[in-house]
């Protein structure tokens, strides 16, 4: 469960990072991206562990609120699933159609940009 939560928060952070404040960005990057402990972040910014914890929880809620309103992550994962299905179908049904395979690969590459 914790791994799934961390993956989701990291994904939401990737989508909505530009909407966060510098402090929120720093704390999230250090905690989720660089695997710092609450104590290490607190020491780095000369604040209490509780302040870091509270900021992280508020920021997680903000990220979830953004996703609830904008659905960027949800739509991205849905498009990726659909693209994977199309790619698998084309690969098995039309394995020798190089143009079709290139077009499907191009769609996949657009999502990764």
Swiss-Prot record:
Domain of life: Bacteria
InterPro entries listed in its UniProt record: RNA_pol_sigma_r3/r4-like, UPF0122, UPF0122_fam_protein, WH-like_DNA-bd_sf
Gene3D superfamilies xref list: Winged helix-like DNA-binding domain superfamily/Winged helix DNA-binding domain
Protein purpose: Might take part in the signal recognition particle (SRP) pathway. This is inferred from the conservation of its genetic proximity to ftsY/ffh. May be a regulatory protein.
Family: Belongs to the UPF0122 family.
HAMAP family (alphabetical): UPF0122 (MF_00245)
Protein name, per record: UPF0122 protein LVIS_0949
